[in-house]
């Protein structure tokens, strides 16, 4: 199977997000890479589902809470940016204050 660097990166994001969600379901607090992966995967999936840019940004902002992450992690993530493919083309999604 031949994958482009962008496809490999997305695959890594989805894999880490999957591992992180399993850890979260077991009650473990998430670290920085895990939190970013979950937020990023939520944005990519929202775009894939046909949501608007605004819907994706809003939905991705409510995926995690401060209780889901280790102390200080929320402060380390002022925003998350990812290029997502929407039904009308590729757009940069910026999720401000992603952990409430």
UniProtKB/Swiss-Prot annotation:
It catalyses: urea + 2 H2O + H(+) = hydrogencarbonate + 2 NH4(+). Its main location: cytoplasm. Keywords: Cytoplasm, Hydrolase. GO terms for biological process: urea catabolic process. GO terms for molecular function: nickel cation binding; urease activity. Pathway: Nitrogen metabolism; urea degradation; CO(2) and NH(3) from urea (urease route): step 1/1. It is found in: Cytoplasm. It comes from the Bacteria. Its EC number is 3.5.1.5. One of its GO terms (cellular component) is cytoplasm. InterPro entries: Urease_gamma, Urease_gamma/gamma-beta_su, Urease_gamma_sf, Urease_subunit. Heterotrimer of UreA (gamma), UreB (beta) and UreC (alpha) subunits. Three heterotrimers associate to form the active enzyme. Belongs to the urease gamma subunit family. This is Urease subunit gamma. It comes from Photorhabdus laumondii subsp. laumondii (strain DSM 15139 / CIP 105565 / TT01) (Photorhabdus luminescens subsp. laumondii). The gene is ureA.
């Amino acid at each position: 199977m031949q994958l482009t660097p962008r496809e490999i990166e997305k695959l890594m994001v989805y894999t880490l997000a999957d591992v992180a969600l399993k850890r979260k379901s077991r009650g473990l607090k998430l670290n920085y890479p895990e939190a970013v992966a979950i937020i990023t995967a939520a944005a990519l999936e929202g775009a894939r589902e046909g949501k608007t840019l605004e819907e994706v940004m809003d939905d991705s902002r409510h995926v995690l809470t401060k209780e889901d992450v280790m102390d200080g992690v929320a402060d380390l993530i002022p925003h998350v940016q990812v290029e997502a493919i929407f039904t009308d083309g590729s757009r940069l999604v910026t999720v401000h204050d992603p952990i409430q």
